[in-house]
Swiss-Prot record:
Lineage: Eukaryota, Fungi, Dikarya, Ascomycota, Pezizomycotina
Keywords of this entry: Carbohydrate metabolism, Cellulose degradation, Glycoprotein, Glycosidase, Hydrolase, Polysaccharide degradation, Secreted, Signal
EC number: 3.2.1.91
Principal location listed in the UniProt entry: secreted
Glycosylation sites: 81, 285
PANTHER family assigned: 1,4-BETA-D-GLUCAN CELLOBIOHYDROLASE A-RELATED, 1,4-BETA-D-GLUCAN CELLOBIOHYDROLASE B
Native source organism of the sequence: Aspergillus oryzae (strain ATCC 42149 / RIB 40) (Yellow koji mold)
Broad class of enzyme this protein falls into: hydrolase
Keyword match Glycoprotein: yes
Name by which UniProt lists this protein: Probable 1,4-beta-D-glucan cellobiohydrolase A
Biological role stated in the UniProt entry: The biological conversion of cellulose to glucose generally requires three types of hydrolytic enzymes: (1) Endoglucanases which cut internal beta-1,4-glucosidic bonds; (2) Exocellobiohydrolases that cut the disaccharide cellobiose from the non-reducing end of the cellulose polymer chain; (3) Beta-1,4-glucosidases which hydrolyze the cellobiose and other short cello-oligosaccharides to glucose.
Amino acid sequence: MHQRALLFSAFWTAVQAQQAGTLTAETHPSLTWQKCAAGGTCTEQKGSVVLDSNWRWLHSVDGSTNCYTGNTWDATLCPDNESCASNCALDGADYEGTYGVTTSGDALTLQFVTGANIGSRLYLMADDDESYQTFNLLNNEFTFDVDASKLPCGLNGAVYFVSMDADGGVAKYSTNKAGAKYGTGYCDSQCPRDLKFINGQANVEGWEPSDSDKNAGVGGHGSCCPEMDIWEANSISTAYTPHPCDDTAQTMCEGDTCGGTYSSERYAGTCDPDGCDFNAYRMGNESFYGPSKLVDSSSPVTVVTQFITADGTDSGALSEIKRFYVQGGKVIANAASNVDGVTGNSITADFCTAQKKAFGDDDIFAQHGGLQGMGNALSSMVLTLSIWDDHHSSMMWLDSSYPEDADATAPGVARGTCEPHAGDPEKVESQSGSATVTYSNIKYGPIGSTFDAPA
């Protein structure tokens, strides 16, 4: 996912300069959500959202000189990782004016392009306004409403969980003084190397500016952790996908050994970059999701995800990830697989094994722990809400046919109705900049507590 500007300040004064200078104060937009109890009683929680540090203005500690401009570091302020962390400070965010982020009650709206800014990624904050809200997903369910009607081919409105540190990495890394309050500490299963700071140090050493993304590049380090994609979607296609890693906590990786999207060898790292995805279209049910389909993406929909454990406890082994939709007052079960050799309408260990075999995919999911590995990470996850475009494969893996050179009629290749490269970033950024996604009515609680479950 694409980011803009990040700080892990090395001195207390760095963050103080940001807070006390003539720059923008950091005020988190409020966002309420509901915590539910068995039986369906839900209590409003007063939360907020924080913008990921990678989007923020990074400037000299004692002034306003850019440490990072476009996709290039300032050679004087950032000659190496350590010096850059000492010399550069993080600024607060004008959420609406600069980033197109607005909240109203329990609703969060993200605009794709606002001025020079492209996309955004935010995290739900705890009520202390200093740390990320964490969730134990085991034996619980997570529900939210989404309006993806304005997201065309090539855009992705994503709701997902990652194993970030709740404090943004402050306790582990003494040079990180900004912390969760400024959106630090991101990681995911791609072991992203486009992050400008990781583990309290800059990522300038080995940095290569992107040829296609005017704001991004790839550095010498990446940041890895398990990722549970609840909802990756536009108006054409949607998928939910667990991505396990060998470690349940955030770790830093080196160069191409990171694997994932940003490295020459995709499967070289300690995480599963592919995951075990359930995309109804890819599973042969082409009439399930989209405009005027069974789940009608032209209208808001409630998305329910349940994390079933083998023994029915909050510490049990993850055995199944179930999906329901609620729209027009009706509960809609997830689409059933229509692929030969693959049965079911939920993610289980058997489903994942059968799917990889049917599609001829390497079972990287199993190599990194499979469903059990994902379950091992679910006891403390941070909620991420974003909108982004894809400079690596134009989102074809979500809404078109992918791999691009594969036979589109072969099992697992077609993922949606978008034409190849309909989602090229240059095209969507110029033609669909006003696209928005709205997430609202977030609920979390025991199985069956956040919606009227079918008998």
